Design a protein with these regions (language model features):
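Membrane-proximal helix-loop-helix units in multi-pass membrane proteins
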Residues: 98-144
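Interfacial helix-start motif at the membrane-water boundary
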Residues: 50-73
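Terminal transmembrane helical module of multi-pass membrane proteins
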Residues: 138-168
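N-terminal signal-anchor transmembrane alpha helix
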Residues: 7-37
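Membrane-interface helix-boundary motifs at transmembrane edges
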Residues: 6-7, 80-93, 142-152
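Hydrophobic cores of alpha-helical transmembrane segments in multi-pass inner/ER membrane proteins
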Residues: 20, 67-77, 128-137
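Interfacial segments of alpha-helical transmembrane regions
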Residues: 12-19, 90-99, 151-156
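C-terminal TM-helix exit segments that contain a strictly Trp-centered aromatic cap at the helix terminus
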Residues: 25-35, 107-112, 162-168
């Protein structure tokens, strides 16, 4: 790995962490500050994630939607930088589909559930592109069966199958 690839790798890693941090901060602050009409706090059993970003319903909707939007754009930059230093052509479809899934997630954060048709369109395309991305990564893992790292390959294979069940 030369110095250019090392710099791109470091930059991609930092943008990826920044994006994950943005998603996490938005989710934590919005869920801690959430109160519904009955005075109840946030619960995954009673409230959807989209309701955290609904203006007029959630006091910290701006934080949640901003974290979702800017975190997704930061993760898009991570995928673009990873695409430049990718050494295996089997990973190109996975990264490209991940970019499309993250752009759909950014659209979901840009248009809250108050703009219902655009919000649901973003959510729908996110699930489609994320499932296709995971499926293409599964193809990459299956064609890499000769890799020495058997444990990480099997763990990634199990996680891919689990996420296909969830997204599919």
């Amino acid at each position: 790995m030369n110095s250019r690839e090392r710099k791109l790798s470091r930059l991609a890693f930092r943008f990826g962490l920044l994006g994950l941090f943005g998603h996490l901060i938005g989710l934590v602050f919005a869920s801690l500050g959430f109160n519904d009409f009955n005075g109840q706090g946030f619960s995954f059993y009673n409230v959807t994630l989209s309701e955290l970003g609904q203006y007029g319903h959630s006091g910290l909707a701006v934080v949640f939607n901003g974290g979702l939007f800017f975190g997704s754009l930061s993760l898009v930059l991570f995928c673009l930088f990873a695409l430049q230093i990718c050494d295996n052509p089997w990973l190109y479809p996975c990264l490209f589909l991940s970019i499309l899934a993250l752009l759909a997630l950014a659209i979901t954060g840009l248009f809250p559930i108050n703009v219902y048709h655009l919000h649901t369109l973003g959510v729908e395309y996110f699930f489609h592109f994320a499932a296709l991305s995971v499926a293409s990564y599964l193809v990459y893992l299956l064609q890499q069966s000769y890799v020495d790292k058997r444990f990480s390959g099997q763990g990634s294979l199990i996680l891919c199958l689990l996420s296909l069940v969830i997204f599919g």
